[in-house]
A protein has these predicted regions:
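Peptidyl-prolyl cis-trans isomerase
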Residues: 17-131
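Glycine-rich loop/hinge motif
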Residues: 13
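Acidic/polar surface patches and capping/hinge elements
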Residues: 1-9
Length: 131
């Protein structure tokens, strides 16, 4: 039996102030090419982000597995990957489910208990699993 899922790589900038988050988002969105937007996000994350876990890695939050039915007892070995911030994880999963988030497009600001997140899905990989 096989199952399909996909993984996304997320980068973000975390700031304390919504106005700053809005300015960062606007700055990134003004770059016409996707690769340029990713580079700008990485540069701005290194300069402005207060996220100690991702700041020095261009805002990289790692890979998130999505599209897998969590109630399926045949879950992937090791469980499901999840973002450490539940508010951001919920936002990402809901946005992907509703198809409002897309690779290369800037999202946010997303408010969480840590502050305001501006981010982007930078890469995605579709997977087929044999169970």
């Amino acid at each position: 039996m096989a199952g399909a899922t996909h993984q996304i790589q997320i980068r973000h900038i975390l700031v304390e102030n919504k106005e700053v988050a809005d300015l960062l988002k606007e700055t990134i969105e003004n770059i016409p090419a996707e690769a340029g937007r990713v580079k700008m996000l990485m540069k701005l994350a290194g300069k402005y982000s207060i996220c100690s876990a991702s700041k020095d890695d261009g805002g990289n939050l790692g890979w998130l597995e999505v599209g897998w039915n969590k109630s399926d007892p045949r879950q992937p070995r090791g469980g499901f990957s999840k973002l450490n911030n539940d508010d951001l994880d919920d936002f990402m999963r809901e946005g992907l489910e509703k198809m409002t988030l897309h690779k290369g497009r800037v999202f946010g600001p997303v408010e969480s208990y840590e502050g305001f997140h501006v981010g982007m899905i930078c890469q995605e990989v579709k997977l087929d699993r044999i169970l």
